[in-house]
Amino acid sequence: MSAAPPRLVVGLGNPGAEYSETRHNAGFWFCERLADTLGVRFSHESRFHGLVANAREAGVWLLMPQTYMNRSGQAIGALARFYRIAPAEILVVHDELDIPPGQLRLKFGGGLGGHNGLKDTSAHLGTNDYWRLRVGIGHPGDRNEVVNFVLKPARREEQTLIDESLDRALAAWPTLAKGDWNTATQRLNARPAPPKPPKAPKAPQPAAADQPKDESQP
């Protein structure tokens, strides 16, 4: 397992306002949050087919491909080759059908889970051996509904859970930036604790004037 810190963080998604709030753009959502945290702005780089930000102090590039999901690897491969970034130094953040909203999975290499953005990324990098942060969006329950599902906005309660998971991922960024992948994996892959139920309000105590008098005394 790679121990090198990431030099390139990629958020997968589709360009355009019509896709900006759809489940498939979860990777973009994380990259936008990370750019805000690092104090950098994206600009379009035609040679890299995407929106690019250079966080020099953090030593990391941020990339949001503008090639549409199924051709994400074109952008990733172009930037990685130009700056000589090894696949093991790349973190790809993407939506994941097989994980419920609110949960995350950090993994290195392995299968692609049928994700077209990952398939194209692996094709252009020539390997599956790069880091992925899988952002749970849930599954519609019917494989025939998957395309329609990922290209629609999440329900309000689901979006709240997804946003909370992205906040947890952002909180783990300092650990990721150091290349401490083991600690980050343990932290991000743990299921979030369920919210504690609110405490029942205490019954009001009667005021002293309302207390019954003791008639046994003379």
Swiss-Prot record:
It comes from Azoarcus sp. (strain BH72). Residues 181-218 are annotated as: Disordered. TRNA binds at Y19, Y68, N70, N116. The keyword RNA-binding applies. It catalyses: an N-acyl-L-alpha-aminoacyl-tRNA + H2O = an N-acyl-L-amino acid + a tRNA + H(+). Hydrolyzes ribosome-free peptidyl-tRNAs (with 1 or more amino acids incorporated), which drop off the ribosome during protein synthesis, or as a result of ribosome stalling. Catalyzes the release of premature peptidyl moieties from peptidyl-tRNA molecules trapped in stalled 50S ribosomal subunits, and thus maintains levels of free tRNAs and 50S ribosomes. Its main location: cytoplasm. It is found in: Cytoplasm. Its EC number is 3.1.1.29. The record marks N14 as: Discriminates between blocked and unblocked aminoacyl-tRNA. One of its GO terms (molecular function) is peptidyl-tRNA hydrolase activity. The record marks D95 as: Stabilizes the basic form of H active site to accept a proton. One of its GO terms (cellular component) is cytoplasm. This is Peptidyl-tRNA hydrolase. The active site is at H24. NCBIfam families: pth.
